[in-house]
Amino acid sequence: MAQQTPLYEQHTLCGARMVDFHGWMMPLHYGSQLDEHHAVRTDAGMFDVSHMTIVDLHGSRTREFLRYLLANDVAKLTKTGKALYSGMLNASGGVIDDLIVYYFTEDFFRLVVNSATREKDLSWITQHAEPYAIDITVRDDLSLIAVQGPNAQEKAATLFTEQQRHAVEGMKPFFGVQAGDLFIATTGYTGEAGYEIAMPNEKAADFWRALVEAGVKPCGLGARDTLRLEAGMNLYGQEMDEGISPLAANMGWTIAWEPADRDFIGREALEMQREKGHEQLVGLVMTEKGVLRNELPVRFTDAQGNQQEGIITSGTFSPTLGYSIALARVPAGIGETAIVQIRNREMPVKVTKPVFVRNGKAVA
């Protein structure tokens, strides 16, 4: 039996089509995925992301533990509330999960991890935390609502107390603050400004209804996927998994190689991959009729004249751009164009950086 978030009833009242998403009943859309997508790009939309797992870590050696657990380096986190995106890797350099870590005090950090990887994440974290005497608290008492879009922060702020508005005033991206009973973070998964707001489960339904009344459009998983793909953001299980290196998933920027004497899980394997060479994640754009879909082959000829083949990891029609886009994992050496096999047709595609839209504007 699939689990329900505290907002399940609100979704049904809003007319959602519910689907099983990694063991959670979640809204796919509320009538029009397209309208939901455009609402986030032009105004404000919201997503129930309560299926994600919030994990609080307490202990005097928490920073030391996270410097070993994660490929990115929490030594960078010195300001209260600052957040960091990182891969959590296995010994062979594969991605167990990608997550966000927040710093509050020297003995209090917070992780937000994916729903699909919850059990293995918690097992991995618990196993490696033991020598550091870390107290691990899974915050199943909290719901999480993402409010995203150019007008999202302004509309969400109409629900805040004066103290909460003051707490978030001027807050830069990738920060979080506990203000009253809300944890408000300037993070998201859409390429737009906004907040991800955690609150006690019993407050979630009223908060959701108030956001609807403030003119924030409920959005489902369908729009969430097209928005994140336009923004060039990875989806676990597609762009990366335990068999795929962050170097092959456009996550090289999340690996903190310095200081060279910092040991972290997967470091040795990544250093070998960096030396030998590795696949890369690129963007693909197809302006001709048709849709680039997951798992379609991508073919090109490298500079040495060798035929090479990669694979589309995520593909869709871009509602913002009006043509098809994709992320693809390919061998190194791809040029500016490639061929994608769609049924019996060979379709030319332009190769771009793996990001297509930022703040509502085309970048590809």
UniProtKB/Swiss-Prot annotation:
UniProt entry keywords in alphabetical sequence: Aminotransferase, Transferase
A single BP term in Gene Ontology: glycine decarboxylation via glycine cleavage system
EC number assigned by the record: 2.1.2.10
GO molecular function: aminomethyltransferase activity; transaminase activity
Enzymatic reactions: N(6)-[(R)-S(8)-aminomethyldihydrolipoyl]-L-lysyl-[protein] + (6S)-5,6,7,8-tetrahydrofolate = N(6)-[(R)-dihydrolipoyl]-L-lysyl-[protein] + (6R)-5,10-methylene-5,6,7,8-tetrahydrofolate + NH4(+)
This protein's record includes keyword Transferase: yes
Keyword Transferase: yes
Annotated PANTHER family: AMINOMETHYLTRANSFERASE, AMINOMETHYLTRANSFERASE, MITOCHONDRIAL
Subunit details: The glycine cleavage system is composed of four proteins: P, T, L and H.
The protein's role, per its UniProt record: The glycine cleavage system catalyzes the degradation of glycine.
Record-stated family: Belongs to the GcvT family.
Protein name per the record: Aminomethyltransferase
Protein's organism: Salmonella paratyphi B (strain ATCC BAA-1250 / SPB7)
Gene: gcvT
